[in-house]
From Swiss-Prot:
Active site (UniProt): E204 (proton donor), E318 (nucleophile)
Catalytic activity field: Random hydrolysis of (1->4)-beta-D-mannosidic linkages in mannans, galactomannans and glucomannans
Signal peptide, first to last residue: 1-26
The protein's name: Mannan endo-1,4-beta-mannosidase 4
InterPro entries in the record: Glycoside_hydrolase_SF (IPR017853), MAN-like (IPR045053)
The organism of origin for this protein: Solanum lycopersicum
Gene designation per UniProt: MAN4
Keyword list, A-Z: Disulfide bond, Glycosidase, Hydrolase, Secreted, Signal
Family listed: Belongs to the glycosyl hydrolase 5 (cellulase A) family.
Amino acid sequence: MNNSIILIFVAILIIFPNEFSKPTRAFSNNNFVYTDGTHFALNGKSLYINGFNAYWLMYIAYDPSTRIKVTNTFQQASKYKMNVARTWAFSHGGSRPLQSAPGVYNEQMFQGLDFVISEAKKYGIHLIMSLVNNWDAFGGKKQYVEWAVQRGQKLTSDDDFFTNPMVKGFYKNNVKVVLTRVNTITKVAYKDDPTILSWELINEPRCPSDLSGKTFQNWVLEMAGYLKSIDSNHLLEIGLEGFYGNDMRQYNPNSYIFGTNFISNNQVQGIDFTTIHMYPNQWLPGLTQEAQDKWASQWIQVHIDDSKMLKKPLLIAEFGKSTKTPGYTVAKRDNYFEKIYGTIFNCAKSGGPCGGGLFWQVLGQGMSSFDDGYQVVLQESPSTSRVILLQSLRLSKLS
């Protein structure tokens, strides 16, 4: 962390001496986050998001003996004034499933998710809940296709997830089961719980079998309409990384296209805000750090401009700095976070559509088996935690 940031941080603690120690308040049961033009809002005021990803919350909460890790994570997030966590509300097949077969659910895993939602509420953390993975981890679309094959469907591609009627039926049934679940702790149905900020249709969707984008567009149209028919309380986003279609492929890393389209997908009725992910070190490994940083700035700006055109808020839903990056240091991670946070703050301060960011990812202490290079253990990362707190405090002053 550079000296100017330290001085700003000290000044904030002097001016707002109670802000650091004051716990975040739990929110009431009546008020849902909504959008107001290009802004998130809550209780009549603009809401700016500073938060984190923790995909593992339900997985860890499955075992009552390890639920303290979930509690500690929310405690730490609240300490640094974070207000949103993005997590998986799925685990399809495998050794610790939420859904072990189509329509067959693991009550212990569901109770783990109940606990996550209940604890998030206690610490004033809203949740973004993703409903399926594009990737194989925790089952993903591959598992849905395999279930259909086991029932006699002649499928040859994981992308059949987006078109096969049986598979789409499996997905819809899962959406209904999750949204109508009544929390065993709070006694509130998920669809009626304002702790949840938003549902996410699918994490990082890609459809390489149809690069025109038509297949995925039709799927979003169908599933957004279906989900909203069950739950009109909550916001909905797709889970996009931000890739454009063929007509704007020059903005994508290496001009690749992935069968999704940031513009047309987000124009679907029922999609309430836009998202992007940012991994220039993975997507553009041949570039220098300076060139990657320049690309990242351009990536954010073009999506700010297009979200303004779409008249929807933008959330930077994943970004991070990997410890596996050549030459990595904590100071470089802090500097990267500062750059992203600065862009978010400047956009928000000027009335723009960028409503916040979620870094990837928070881990609790003693969770080294979950390390993926991007982990931030807040208790063990004082300088990064201060950068996060500074962002939380200055965004809160805009509300």
